[in-house]
């Protein structure tokens, strides 16, 4: 009797490796909404997969699946079981393994999105895990947020300031926030967004394409 044959793992056919985009920010700032909008805005042109992080659940994976951001098989939820910061920086092994598993399923993926669990302004991604980092804050957190600094504010490749529509309700001055952001970030870019209304999403997509050399 012949031994059973098993299909060899699919191999990547594209020359360039996939771009890994890390999305971080405090709880409730709009990370999952941004990821949803990016997937919906880029999935027709690029082969996408997404990894979400939660401490004790896979809630963000569920929300993205319900929203139809990507087919269910292309969204993987990771339960970190501890500090969200650790899982993307000091010991990113659980996320590195998730990336490896997703690329085994979809070897020709162009972009791997990795959404961190909600964390503070000190959160940063390990360079082993992410090629580009996007940090999301929101106006509802207060006009002072950009002035507080922290690696997420000052060192991320792109800062997204979300929920601009709430500025009048919380007494935040968007011009002051923009000025403070420029002082804290120097030449590093930022985008003012109202993600629910898709305002600013195109700018984030353009940044990913240009900075990630996807348009070359």
Swiss-Prot record:
Source organism: Burkholderia mallei (strain ATCC 23344)
NCBIfam families on file: ureG (TIGR00101)
Compartment(s) of residence: Cytoplasm
PANTHER family named among the record's database cross-references: UREASE ACCESSORY PROTEIN G
UniProt xrefs under InterPro entries: CobW/HypB/UreG_nucleotide-bd (IPR003495), P-loop_NTPase (IPR027417), UreG (IPR004400)
Protein family (similarity comment): Belongs to the SIMIBI class G3E GTPase family. UreG subfamily.
Role of this protein: Facilitates the functional incorporation of the urease nickel metallocenter. This process requires GTP hydrolysis, probably effectuated by UreG.
Molecular function per GO: GTP binding; GTPase activity; nickel cation binding
Protein name: Urease accessory protein UreG
